[in-house]
Each structure stands twice: as C-alpha cells, then as structure tokens.
C-alpha cells in the first residue's frame, strides 16, 4: 500500500480521497495546506492523522510515496516539479501545466529521478469512452465531431460582482479553456490524435480571462468543435 500526500483542500480532493479509499490500494497519509487552521480542518474532516503547512517538510518525509496535486492551475507545474525532484510519484490534476514546455520539463525530471507523473483526467479512462474508441471504425465516414461541456460556475455570480476567486483569476489560470474545455480536448485527441490546425474563439471577461469559448480543430477529412463554458450551461 502506497502512502499518499494531498495538496489542496477543494471538492475535487474530497472526491479523490473517497475514490482512493474505495480502491483500497492507497493509504491517505497526510495533507498539505497553506495555513495550519485549514490543514488541520481538512485532515480532521477525512480522518487523516498528519498534516503539513510547509511543502519542503512534507516532501522530505520519507513515508510519502505519492503526491496528489490539486492546487490552483498556475501552481501545478511548480508543486509537481518539487515533488518529482524529491523522487515522489505525482498525480497532477488537470490542466497538467499551462505550457507544453513545462509539461515536457516535468516528464524529463520524472525520468531522471526514476518516478512517474500522471494527469488526473477522467473521461478518457471511462468504460464508455473505451467502447467508442473500439468501435470508431464502425461509424462510417466521419465529417463532424461536436463536444460540449458547459457548466455554469457556482462562482460566476461573484465574478460578475467583481469579487475575485481563483476560478476566475488570470493569475491562477482560472480560464474556461483550462478548467472545462480540457475535457473536450482529451476526448477528441484521444480518439483522433493531433489535429493539423487549431483555432480558438472566446468570450472574454472584464479581467481578460475567457469565460467560455469554442475550439475548432481541423483534421484531414473532418472538423471537430469543442465548446467549453463557465458562464452558461448546456442541455
């Protein structure tokens, strides 16, 4: 059984802890949060005995095998890099990193230190997705692929009231492309590979972030569109 350290205290971490316990192969060893009050509160909530407020101290704990990174998007690269450099396995929440350069660097660091890093993306691992993949050749001549993941954010009203939250903060990469449309991108590229060209058309909020947008992906014989929104919902 491998010992897991979690970084972050949002709802997604609650769900990951629940999933790991259901799986039975992981021991929830410790949690990390920036403040002692929040770290203790989150640890107590999940019955985890150990908590840290110092990242370096946590990573120096020899009992930690895996680090699950679920902090704001802009921190994924830095925190994953620190964990890999301490020879910890890493499960990094989506979006993996803001840039391809950072992504490739993390893979190189993992390889150098003899550990692995994974992106915690879910949809491409679901049984129904595998069925689609296995039966794609039976679908005939594909000309259009349409994906839509639009979910009105519970924090959008606060954003409209000019109350800043991480979910809509450009400093934390709180944008629709990375938060929502990333699922559509995985869905399409997992089935069809890299497109020959990509265009992104977005609705931009008052602070410069995209609150929704449409990606058009051009393949040799068809077009795929990916719609992702945090400012409205789809059926």
Regions found by a protein language model. Give the residues of each.
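Short active-site oxyanion
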Residues: 26-30, 65-67, 117, 174
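Rossmann-fold dehydrogenase core element
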Residues: 105-122, 141-144
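Contiguous beta-strand/loop segments that form the cofactor/metal-binding neighborhood of enzyme cores
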Residues: 185-235
């Amino acid at each position: 059984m491998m010992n897991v350290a979690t970084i972050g205290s949002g709802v997604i971490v609650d769900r990951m802890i629940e999933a790991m316990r259901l799986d039975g192969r992981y021991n929830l060893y410790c949690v990390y949060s920036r403040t002692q009050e929040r770290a203790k509160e989150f640890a107590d909530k999940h019955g985890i005995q150990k908590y840290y407020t110092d990242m370096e101290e946590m990573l120096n704990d020899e009992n930690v095998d895996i680090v699950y990174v679920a902090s704001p998007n802009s921190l994924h690269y830095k925190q994953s890099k620190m964990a890999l450099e301490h020879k910890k396995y890493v499960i990094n929440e989506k979006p993996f990193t803001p840039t391809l350069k950072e992504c490739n660097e993390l893979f190189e660091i993992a390889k150098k230190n003899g550990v692995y890093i994974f992106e915690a993306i879910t949809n491409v691992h679901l049984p129904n997705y595998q069925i689609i993949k296995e039966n794609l050749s039976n679908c005939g001549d594909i000309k259009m692929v349409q994906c839509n993941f639009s979910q009105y954010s519970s924090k959008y009203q606060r954003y409209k009231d000019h109350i800043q939250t991480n979910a809509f903060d450009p400093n934390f990469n709180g944008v629709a492309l990375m938060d929502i449309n990333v699922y559509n991108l995985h869905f399409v590229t997992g089935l069809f590979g890299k497109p020959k060209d990509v265009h992104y058309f977005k609705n931009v909020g008052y602070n410069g972030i995209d609150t929704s947008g449409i990606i058009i992906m051009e393949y040799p014989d068809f077009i795929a569109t990916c719609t992702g929104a945090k400012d409205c919902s789809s059926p």
